[in-house]
């Protein structure tokens, strides 16, 4: 009996030891996993998102030659721009939606682990602004693009160029250290500024391909003269500028590359003029008071994102499409996201022709005539915007079909989905309502309109300072 009892006790002890060891191993594994998760979140809360973006950009942009300008003849433009149009826009929209979802999941993980999150729900800003060392990794911005212009890499693959001189004395032989000297170079460049400056351009600033103008950390104004021309080139990022009081200039010789200068006829006085170009991203700029448009994209331009900008005090804000008869603009795809259309605006936010336009999560607080207009059968997909109508009871309608009979425009695909309409604002839809009809005008997942105030709260040029989250 004693021997049996001793055996039973031994078996019980062995079982208890095994259970204890198992529990200890499980607990250690759980702690290790938790620590690993926290470490990964601290190191890069958006690592999965960034990797996916880089993979997407690399795959889609392999065919572009990073050292060659776009064609400089209209005859060659259709072939060039066709490559900028998504082969399967529905797939693109799904991919971008997945990236946004991953960003949301990363923020949720941070909150569960008790870490501070500076996320706003704006996927562009949440991609880079939380990093207090943003100035040490400026080129990360190029991996944060969304929408149809998301593949614009600007000067990501080139060296930095520091603008030290705000003058523009010689537009044919620009001085090294000036903005004009930087933007005409053939090589990719990431252009930054040594200090705050006001640049008064004598003639339009004609950019070359693969350039980023990055004014973060400095208060940079392009004002009281000519402004920016993006003509027959590709891959440009313009970020952080104050552009205002642009004037018509021209009838002068102007250099456009180290090896070429030529006669320029009169320019209209746009803040940013995009002409026959692709893969363009205009982000976090403050634009106002110009002679013609604030952002105009014409003559076969496509693959454009206009995001996080603050537009004020202007009549004809944004023109997308050259003319009703210029059918090459049928390939145009433009994303207009997270912008604030603010005080003193009248019309064209935007005014569209022919192509496909995704207007998403913008804040429209002021217009005098209308917000969104068009002609020549554009497809307009308005999602998650906030439209606050003016007090004028004759200007409550968000939309305007320009010089077109109702019998014709009723066939155009214009829809409002999830928009917040305030103070009597109303959006007049037309054409198809099914999502399938808007595949080529869909470029990212819209947030609820209730988030627009937060998403657009810092639209315009940012007051970034080194060593602090921007």
Curated annotation (Swiss-Prot):
Pathway: Glycan metabolism; pectin degradation; 2-dehydro-3-deoxy-D-gluconate from pectin: step 2/5. Residues 1-22 form the signal peptide. Binds 1 Ca(2+) ion. Required for its activity. Ca(2+) binds at residues 268, 292, 296. Pfam families: Pectate_lyase_4. Transmembrane segments: none annotated. It catalyses: Eliminative cleavage of (1->4)-alpha-D-galacturonan to give oligosaccharides with 4-deoxy-alpha-D-galact-4-enuronosyl groups at their non-reducing ends. Expressed in flowers, but not in leaves. Its cofactor is Ca(2+). Glycans are attached at residues 46, 65, 106. InterPro entries: AmbAllergen (IPR018082), Pec_lyase (IPR002022), Pectin_lyas_fold (IPR012334), Pectin_lyase_fold/virulence (IPR011050), PEL (IPR045032). SUPFAM superfamilies: Pectin lyase-like. Its EC number is 4.2.2.2. GO terms for biological process: pectin catabolic process. GO terms for molecular function: metal ion binding; pectate lyase activity. Keywords: Calcium, Glycoprotein, Lyase, Metal-binding, Signal. The active site is at 348. Gene3D superfamilies: Single-stranded right-handed beta-helix, Pectin lyase-like. Belongs to the polysaccharide lyase 1 family. This is Probable pectate lyase 15. It comes from Arabidopsis thaliana (Mouse-ear cress).
